[in-house]
Amino acid sequence: MLTNNNNHPFHMVDYSPWPLTGAIGAMILTSGMTKWFHTFNMNLLMIGMTVIVLTMIQWWRDVVREGTFQGLHTKLVSKGLRWGMILFIASEVLFFASFFWAFFNSSLAPTIELGMKWPPMGIQPFNPIQIPLLNTAILLASGVTITWAHHSIMECNHSQALQGLFFTVMLGFYFTLLQMYEYWEAPFTIADAVYGSTFFVATGFHGLHVIIGTTFLLTCLIRHMMNQFSSNHHFGFEAAAWYWHFVDVVWLFLYLSIYWWGS
């Protein structure tokens, strides 16, 4: 199989059950979420989440085996993976553009139902120089630490790369905890007019991306501890770093538009 895969200029994917189990898990997860919304029963939701997590772990394990131990990630394959990550991030940019469009469409010309003002009548927005500003500083600091880790890997400095990755993961966890606290103390809900809807959908999806990025970086941290990255073969880390910088930039736009200008 190794010889066959290296004798042609194509990225041949081995047979894998994980796309199927991932699709089944996603179906169960969305069905369970709908059930949870209506009946407050999380059983089906937790089953779907378990299937998704197990699929992720085993799918990533197979990709690591192919790229690190079998040598299947040739230069052409790596180029394809890079373009795939670039296109994925581009699709995420358009995804968040729709949220900003909804926010500015509502805020630049408030309707009479909103009291002809923004924020709408009765809405007490967050103070942008409190938790939101702290979260901004946390993500900016995490951008510095992930860059530190990247340069350390390219310079074959194992210990500093480990430190940079560890600090980035910790900052990601800290951001998520602060976001949860902010939601818990929020003086408005997702049902409070279009302001509440756009606020929680935009910041909530960004928070989900922070959790995904933190998981991605935690995986890279574990792989680095197992000496699976070299100075010229570490695209898994590069992809995680690109994704994390994207999350940073999106948060800056969220902070400036929703927290600062929108308040």
From Swiss-Prot:
Source organism (scientific name): Locusta migratoria
Localization: Mitochondrion inner membrane
GO cellular component: mitochondrial inner membrane
Documented EC number(s): 7.1.1.9
Domain of life (superkingdom): Eukaryota
Gene3D superfamilies: 1.10.287.70, Cytochrome c oxidase, subunit III, four-helix bundle
Residue intervals passing through the bilayer: 9-29, 40-60, 84-104, 129-149, 161-181, 198-218, 241-261
Designated name of the protein: Cytochrome c oxidase subunit 3
Keywords per UniProt: Membrane, Mitochondrion, Mitochondrion inner membrane, Translocase, Transmembrane, Transmembrane helix
Residues in the signal sequence: none
Entry keyword annotation includes Membrane: yes
Assigned protein family: Belongs to the cytochrome c oxidase subunit 3 family.
Pfam families, alphabetized: COX3
